[in-house]
């Protein structure tokens, strides 16, 4: 019986989505999946509902390699309001404390410099980090505070894009696991005041930029062929790894769980992108230097990679 619903299809590739404000990352993902009628989809790192910007969405076989984008460096543009602390660290919470807001540019610059480099950061309660199987934000909404350990992160740069206290806009380049809400609070703490985020936009991840992204509205106005043309190939997610070309027999060995011979001047356990002699992406294999072999890590489905 025909229900009238569009039939799901095997879509493989990466969509650079510009997530709008007010949607959770999962809601944005599901909207994109429905637009493409894709059987399978996943994203590569959560953005808060308040936040906008770059959210790479993986369809089909690309989901096998999504984890490698989670470890990537990222860039954000954050808007801060100085002098006010929020219960959530952003504009969605209630103002719970106030302090001086007449901050000078020199004070703000000094604080930004102090928070640049390899630093320790305590994750916020309003985060998706798990404690006993539940995300921290579920505890936070009940008023329960869980002790969190500080983690090492790297803030490569904090550039001040705009400053007119109590408003400040900063461009941040940082490592994975950096919470910009917490960074903003820590900048203010260094000055002796409070701050919370009023806007946050992810502008870059793993070398992809917001200029390459597409809004849900723009995607909805395209036909299927036009939308599909915007998808990036699955191997863009692992383009930072070295690559090699194998003959058909060696590729067959990988798919059969065997380990073809391979010799390269690479550290042991290095992930290697594998391609066939005609340029087809096979997947990732691990270089086992001590025995000069390649071990399959994550391989494309043969039907999908041949498409």
UniProtKB/Swiss-Prot annotation:
The active site is formed by 48 (nucleophile)
* Family matches, as Gene3D superfamilies: Pseudouridine synthase (3.30.2350.10), PUA domain (2.30.130.10)
Enzyme Commission number, as recorded: 5.4.99.25
Please name the Pfam families in this protein's record.
TruB-C_2 (PF09157), TruB_C_2 (PF16198), TruB_N (PF01509)
* Entry-linked SUPFAM superfamilies: Pseudouridine synthase, PUA domain-like
What GO molecular-function term can you cite, just one? pseudouridine synthase activity
**Coiled-coil residue spans:** none
Q: Which keywords label this protein?
A: Isomerase, tRNA processing
Quick one: signal sequence residues?
A: none
Keyword Isomerase carried by entry: yes
Q: Which InterPro entries match?
A: PsdUridine_synth_cat_dom_sf, PsdUridine_synth_N, PUA-like_sf, PUA_sf, tRNA_psdUridine_synth_TruB, tRNA_sdUridine_synth_fam1_C, TruB_C
Reaction equations catalysed = uridine(55) in tRNA = pseudouridine(55) in tRNA
Q: Does the keyword Disulfide bond apply?
A: no
Name the GO terms of the biological process aspect: mRNA pseudouridine synthesis; tRNA modification; tRNA pseudouridine synthesis
Write down the NCBIfam families for this protein, in alphabetical order.
TruB (TIGR00431)
The record's comment on protein family reads: Belongs to the pseudouridine synthase TruB family. Type 1 subfamily.
Entry-linked HAMAP family: TruB_bact
- Protein role: Responsible for synthesis of pseudouridine from uracil-55 in the psi GC loop of transfer RNAs.
The protein here is known as: tRNA pseudouridine synthase B
Name the source organism. Neisseria meningitidis serogroup B (strain ATCC BAA-335 / MC58)
């Amino acid at each position: 019986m025909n229900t009238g619903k569009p039939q799901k299809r095997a879509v493989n590739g990466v969509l650079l989505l510009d997530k709008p404000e007010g949607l959770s990352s999962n809601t944005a993902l599901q909207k994109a999946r429905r637009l493409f009628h894709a059987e399978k989809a996943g994203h590569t790192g959560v953005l808060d509902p308040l936040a906008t910007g770059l959210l790479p969405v993986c369809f089909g076989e690309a989901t096998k390699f999504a984890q490698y984008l989670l470890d990537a460096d990222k860039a954000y543009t954050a808007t801060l309001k100085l002098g006010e602390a929020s219960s959530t660290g952003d504009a969605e919470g209630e103002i719970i404390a106030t302090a001086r807001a007449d901050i000078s540019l020199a004070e703000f610059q000094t604080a930004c410099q102090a928070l640049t480099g390899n630093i320790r950061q305590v994750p916020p309660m309003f985060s998706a980090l798990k404690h006993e199987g539940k995300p921290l934000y579920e505890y936070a909404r009940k008023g329960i505070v869980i002790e969190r350990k500080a983690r090492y992160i790297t803030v490569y740069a904090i550039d001040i894009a705009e400053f007119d206290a109590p408003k400040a806009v900063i461009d941040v380049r940082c490592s994975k696991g950096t919470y910009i809400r917490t960074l903003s609070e820590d900048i203010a703490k260094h000055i002796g005041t409070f701050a919370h985020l009023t806007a946050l936009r992810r502008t870059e991840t793993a070398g992809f930029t917001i200029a390459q992204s597409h809004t849900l509205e723009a995607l909805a106005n395209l036909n299927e062929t036009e939308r599909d043309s915007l998808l990036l190939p699955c191997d863009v997610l692992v383009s930072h790894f070295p690559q090699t070309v194998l003959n058909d027999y060696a590729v067959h060995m990988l798919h059969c769980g065997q380990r073809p011979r391979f010799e390269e001047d690479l550290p042991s356990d290095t992930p290697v992108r594998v391609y066939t002699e005609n340029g087809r992406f096979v997947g990732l294999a691990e270089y086992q230097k001590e025995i000069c072999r390649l071990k399959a890590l994550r391989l494309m489905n043969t039907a999908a990679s041949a498409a």
